[in-house]
Amino acid sequence: MLAAPLPSFSTDAFDQVVMSTYGRFPITLVRGEGCRVWDDQGRSYLDFVAGIATCTLGHAHPALVETVSRQMQTLHHVSNLYYIPQQGALAQWLVAHSCGDRVFFCNSGAEANEAAIKLARKYAHTVRHIANPIIITAQASFHGRTLATITATGQPKYQKYFDPLVPGFAYVPYNDLGALEALVASLDQPQPQVAAILLEPLQGEGGVRPGDRAYFEQVRQLCTEKGILLIFDEVQVGMGRTGSLWGYETLGVEPDIFTSAKGLAGGVPIGAMIAKEFCAVFQPGDHASTFGGNPLATAAALTVCETLEKENLLENVRDRGQQLRTGLQELAAAYPQVIAEVRGWGLINGLELQPDTPLTAAEVVKAALAEGLLLVPAGPKVVRFVPPLIVSATEIDMALGAMSRALAHLAA
């Protein structure tokens, strides 16, 4: 494989010209293959970040490399004013493998959630005749960085300094049916105002907190009884990461609308909003995306979808996820003064630190980095493990070994 030419730059020069929106770790990654990446000094790392649950097939997967290379040589972008075969084929696959009927393509999870919010509002106005629709979301949720999606996000730290926020959102504790029922009853007086309930099947950025099956079943019943749309944000958990293709399948509850992005095209930018026919009320001019559904991104995504099936990756996710959780639970037993809980589904798992330990998730991530393992925080006290779905049993064992060494160093 030919290596891409590497621009010559220093991290100091980088920091002088790139806006400071990230707190970066002090390594420069230049190459990847499978579940490994290499820095500019030639050191390799086991990648359990995967671009934050994005590199579904790992790095430089032959099928994805071949598809993207071929598509770039053929046709990489045209306007949605024309029919795009790859887009149609991907939409067909998504509809055939989900509860949805119609697909809107965009470029990211935030854009997909924006599309879902707009669709829910239009449905509320045109079908239910709600003048001022309200969408309920969960506290500690995360739905994106645009103005509407940070408003939907139930974490004030993401909203600070961006007032005035978008009106029409309300918040309840996650997995708390009583609080949700009370809020709906309050908002729907004297007439209905609740247009939709937007939830993550598992809260990712909020600390890797799985949804409670009984709670979601009752939320589904509530929405059906009142005509409220149920929207699932599947951006981080969808495309096989939970061990099912979609997080809603893990819960056994179907939404009316759901969103996908991150892992859908294995690292090529894409987003999708999938809706059931009855609420797919968009008409020409209601919404659009210049790059959404372009031939390159949709060809890549279709290859990811087909590879999930061909390589039986859902079974691998379930097996390797159980192996990882078992190993993390053993580490929790060995370091009870540090680790409070291990939780997750499939290959999205969180290790929560004890509330009284001075250690932060960022410090644990830095210690793991020194041992050649890339991890990512999910809040101040939770370390997140989201490796590529192709991860092997040997690589899980190596990651657990690196974590053991990191914890031993921190506990010393």
Swiss-Prot record:
Gene3D superfamilies: Aspartate Aminotransferase, domain 1, Type I PLP-dependent aspartate aminotransferase-like (Major domain)
One Pfam family here: Aminotran_3
Catalysis: reaction(s): N(2)-acetyl-L-ornithine + 2-oxoglutarate = N-acetyl-L-glutamate 5-semialdehyde + L-glutamate
Involved pathway(s): Amino-acid biosynthesis; L-arginine biosynthesis; N(2)-acetyl-L-ornithine from L-glutamate: step 4/4
Subcellular location: Cytoplasm
EC number(s) stated in the UniProt entry for this protein: 2.6.1.11
CDD domains found in the cross-reference section: OAT_like (cd00610)
Transmembrane regions: none
Amino-acid positions noted as binding pyridoxal 5'-phosphate in the UniProt annotation, renumbered to this chain: G109, A110, F142, D233, E234, V235, Q236, T290
Cofactor binding comment, as recorded: Binds 1 pyridoxal phosphate per subunit.
GO CC, alphabetical: cytoplasm
Binding site for N(2)-acetyl-L-ornithine: R145, S289
Domain of life, per lineage: Bacteria
Residues found modified as N6-(pyridoxal phosphate)lysine: K262
Entry GO MF terms: identical protein binding; N2-acetyl-L-ornithine:2-oxoglutarate 5-aminotransferase activity; pyridoxal phosphate binding
Keywords: Amino-acid biosynthesis, Aminotransferase, Arginine biosynthesis, Cytoplasm, Pyridoxal phosphate, Transferase
Miscellaneous: May also have succinyldiaminopimelate aminotransferase activity, thus carrying out the corresponding step in lysine biosynthesis.
Family the UniProt entry places it in: Belongs to the class-III pyridoxal-phosphate-dependent aminotransferase family. ArgD subfamily.
HAMAP family membership: ArgD_aminotrans_3
Protein's UniProt name: Acetylornithine aminotransferase
Organism: Thermosynechococcus vestitus (strain NIES-2133 / IAM M-273 / BP-1)
Taxonomic lineage of the native organism: Bacteria, Bacillati, Cyanobacteriota, Cyanophyceae, Acaryochloridales
Gene assigned in the entry: argD
